[in-house]
Amino acid sequence: AFLHDSLAGYYPLSLTERARQISRALHAHLPADYPQAIRLLLASSRVSHARRAAQGMGGFLFMPHMMFIAEHGLDHFEASMQAQHELTQRFTAEFSIRPFIERHPEATLARLAQWTQDPSPHVRRLVSEGTRPRLPWASRLRDFQRDPAPVLALLERLKDDPELYVRRSVANNLNDIGKDHPDLLADVARRWLQNASPERRWIVRHALRSAIKRAEPGALSALGYGAAPTLAIERVRIEPKRLHEGGSVDIGFELHNTGAHSQSVMAAFVVNYVK
């Protein structure tokens, strides 16, 4: 019966629709007692073939588990948090954790603060990725868009994490924050760059990437590009003059420093397309 309900009309469905259908089938066939149901789900994830399947794209096997927790576990905080701690090491709990942030903000943030020191990089990454205000594929965390201070407190604990996997998530979270609070992002960038390791400098530059594209003054200043440049642009060359689909264009020019001192310069091209 479980297989029948899981696979009914399965193949035309999208990835998330398939996972949601399996999650509904789990709810229909697992015990009604949530803690007992979670124990069974976790037991199924611990068998050897499930651990092997969690490698690579096989981790999506556990997407229905996460949906089940998000939809039915909000009234069972401790059991659900323990389950997400274990399952996120097989498939990310960045989506399922968000309803708990909204329903139980203080308790969830306190648990996430503990997890910043967890031995598993998957758990530490969850702290950052799950609190992103604008996480792709997920509903926005509006409270964190208005006031990202609770998120920044967590990111402070992760900014020197030994795993690039975690640091990249920290940078992406800051990039999200900067879309709503550009001045705050610039302030964090300047502070983090003080006596920064190469790894932390990478976080800052990656976090500022969208702000730099928008030419935001605070972001440019944080990276040393704030002053008005004294430059002359000469010998501009664009070849060919006409371009066919699939072709390439070469752009060349010379930049001359017309001032008395050395300066840091960021050059960017603006391309306009005929519509």
PLM regions and their residue ranges:
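Helix-loop elements that line ligand-binding/catalytic pockets
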Residues: 232, 242, 251
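Short beta-strand elements of extracellular/lumenal beta-sandwich folds
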Residues: 245-257
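Short beta-strand segments of immunoglobulin-like
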Residues: 237-243
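Contiguous segments within soluble domain cores/interaction surfaces
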Residues: 229-231, 258-275
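Long, positively charged binding patches that form subdomain-scale interaction surfaces
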Residues: 237, 248, 260
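Hydrophobic alpha-helix feature that most strongly marks membrane-spanning transmembrane helices
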Residues: 212, 216, 254, 272-274
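Surface-facing alpha-helical segments and adjacent helix-coil boundary elements at the starts of domains
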Residues: 1-219, 250, 261-266
